[in-house]
Amino acid sequence: MTMAALDVFNVPYSVPLLGSTVVILIGFIAIKALRVGSRPKGLPPGPPTEFIWGNTKQIDLFYPQYQYRKWAQQYGPVYTVMLGDTAHVVVSGLRDVRDIFIKQGASSQNRPPSRFQLLMRDGFFPGLNNGEKWRQSRRMWQAVLNNSAAKQYLPYQELETRQLLFDLLRAPTEWRDHIERYSNSVAMTMVNGRRIIDAADPRVKETIQDLYDLAETGVRGAFLDSWPFLWKLPEWMFPVCRQARKIAAKHREYIWRNYSDVAKRTSQGEVLPSVNHAIQEKLKQGWPGVSEIEGAEIGHHLLTGTTDTTASTLINWVAAMCLHPEAQKKAQEEIDRVVGPNRLPTDADAANLPYVQQVIQEAQRWITAVPLSLPRAANAPVHWGKYTIPEETGLIMNSHALHNDPDIFPEPDKFKPERWEGKPNASSNGDAQLLFTFGAGRRVCPGQHLAERSLFLVISHWLWGFDTLQATDDDKNKIPIDKDDLRPGFIVCLNPFPAKITPRTAQHRELIERIWKEELEVSLDESQQWKATPEGIARLLERVGK
């Protein structure tokens, strides 16, 4: 060391220099600390923040959509909230959603860092990943779920709808379980090549609980992503991380069990074409950058999304029919004119049943199954008015506020299917989009076409065959249904409520029984599994596996 260097430590220079350095360092740390929870400069304004907490304590984190809607009324269609020390821009205006998520979709397609939620999925969950991992998953989903491909699954959906009608005859009070079996069976047959023949099958609840665990525990552990510096501390300090790892192990066992069952049946020559079988074939041929457990997760992603979104929307629709019998009656009158009592509705009837379609659209608006879509993040600067939203800033599509905006939907609390007259394509991803159940832009739900067909088939058949009434107690008083009594999560639906489901006539009952008996004899084997995969599905999945 040179004498000049040593001079730094000599008195009288060393003490003032060291003191100044410490003061500057403490000041820098203090300034940084005082800014924790405060809104960064240059972002759209929003509600006042609190030191450290930001806006976190002002929000019910299990039901944030309600507070976000109130703030939209106060601060405008685009505002910024601070969840801890992370900024999120909440977008609630129709024009603004179209601008930020559709027109600027190339810059608003990422997911924000979700390290805690990814902890519950061993680091890989396609819907929360970015970059090449997400693109690989998306390409697979698009191949099996694009508009043309989704049409091929119609035989699966028709058969499951017919069982649903029969199940409603057999056990009408268990209507919620029948809905969940329907949606899970369509998904299971697609993904694993095996039907769910009974609502008591534990895989139905297991599938729904798997996604609920991710959502519910994700809220409890969200503070770790809200204050990212906490990840620098040992994981053992946070009990919620232990819970997350337990959920990850449970999830891994579940998806691997389904995936391995397909491989086992393939080796025994019993497999039917399925998404997981196509994934396994693709992996055998070499799928760069995708491991086998990741392949299993890509397939499972379709299973959970298809099951829960469809089931939740149908459950919410049942409540709408209980509370709005006039809409139900009008839809049934239309079905009676077009279909009549001597046959079931078909997918081809959709164009001739505009009011039924409007009922379906209104049900999705009235209670939005995915009220905040899934959070996004800017992957490039996003421009809104005079503001530039920088890369990595969180973006929240406030579908709940959009669907309850009185300027777009007058009297939004009322169930009015007529508001959708002349708007059959309101959910189509684009500049004219009005309905955002499935999101918008580059991250729109890939299963939208399949889900919309399921909603039409189930609702048109249900209206054709059954009356749905509000249940009554022993004193004949109607049992209330609160449309805000929701199960929390990414995907919301009403908590359990009773409904009275009865066949419309003996003629409707007889036709339901006869058609299901024919399905058992013609389409299904003695274990009520498909005797053979419909040709269109087999060809599609064979192509995907190459």
From Swiss-Prot:
Q: Where in the cell is it found?
A: Membrane
- Coiled-coil regions listed in the entry: none
Indicate which residues are glycosylated according to the record.
Answer: N146, N258, N425
Q: Transmembrane ranges? A: 11-31
A Pfam family assignment: p450
Could you cite one Gene Ontology molecular function of this protein?
Answer: iron ion binding
The UniProt record lists the EC number as 1.-.-.-
Primary localization: membrane
Cofactor requirements of the protein: heme
Induction per UniProt is:
Expression is controlled by the asperlin biosynthesis cluster-specific transcription factor alnR.
Keywords recorded for this protein, A-Z: Glycoprotein, Heme, Iron, Membrane, Metal-binding, Monooxygenase, Oxidoreductase, Transmembrane, Transmembrane helix
Highest taxon, organism lineage: Eukaryota
Q: Kindly list the GO CC terms recorded for this protein.
A: membrane
Membrane topology qualifier:
Single-pass membrane protein
Q: Which PROSITE patterns match?
A: CYTOCHROME_P450
Inactivation phenotype: Fully eliminates the production of asperlin.
Describe the task this protein carries out: Cytochrome P450 monooxygenase; part of the gene cluster that mediates the biosynthesis of asperlin, a polyketide showing anti-inflammatory, antitumor and antibiotic activities. The first step of the asperlin biosynthesis is the production of the intermediate 2,4,6-octatrienoic acid by the highly redusing polyketide synthase alnA with cleavage of the PKS product by the esterase alnB. 2,4,6-octatrienoic acid is further converted to asperlin via several steps involving the remaining enzymes from the cluster.
Name used for this protein in its record: Cytochrome P450 monooxygenase alnH
Which organism does this sequence originate in?
Emericella nidulans (strain FGSC A4 / ATCC 38163 / CBS 112.46 / NRRL 194 / M139) (Aspergillus nidulans)
- List the gene name: alnH
